[in-house]
Amino acid sequence: MPAILIVDDNPIQAVTRRLILEKAHFPVVLADGAPAALARFESGEPFGMVITDHCMPEMGGPELVKKLRALSTTLPIVVLSGLPEAESEYEGMDIYFRLKPIHPQELIELSRTLLFPPYCQIA
């Protein structure tokens, strides 16, 4: 299973999310900011999805998402923010926006849904 890349400049937030997802048996890789995340992608490391913070120094969530979309149009990307108005900055970028704090079970279920989408069955 490809890993989930968590991008957050706050190590406490990043490690907390990693522990939640690892307990649910997801492989997780951390990046301490957008430049580190892009470097991992450009090296060819395979990821099944990205969970990123909105507000980060050097490069914020919207710029990171634009760069990730240039590399992959189908990669599931979840953006977390404490600012409800931030969602408008991602219009047309095909992301999943969630407000912080996100409940651990919601994070697990969202990850499961995005990594293992349900298939249509013909009755």
At which residue positions do the language-model features occur?
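Hydrophobic/aromatic residues positioned on beta-strands within the core alpha/beta folds
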Residues: 80-81
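Active-site residues of response regulator receiver
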Residues: 53
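C-terminal output helix
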Residues: 102-115, 119-122
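Charged docking surfaces used in two-component/phosphorelay signaling
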Residues: 15-23
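Receiver (REC) domain active-site loop signature in two-component systems and cognate sites
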Residues: 56
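Short acidic/polar segment at the start of the alpha1 helix of CheY-like receiver
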Residues: 10-14
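Short amphipathic alpha-helix used as the core "switch/output" element in two-component signaling
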Residues: 39, 62-73
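Helix N-cap/capping motif at the beta->alpha junctions
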Residues: 30-39, 61
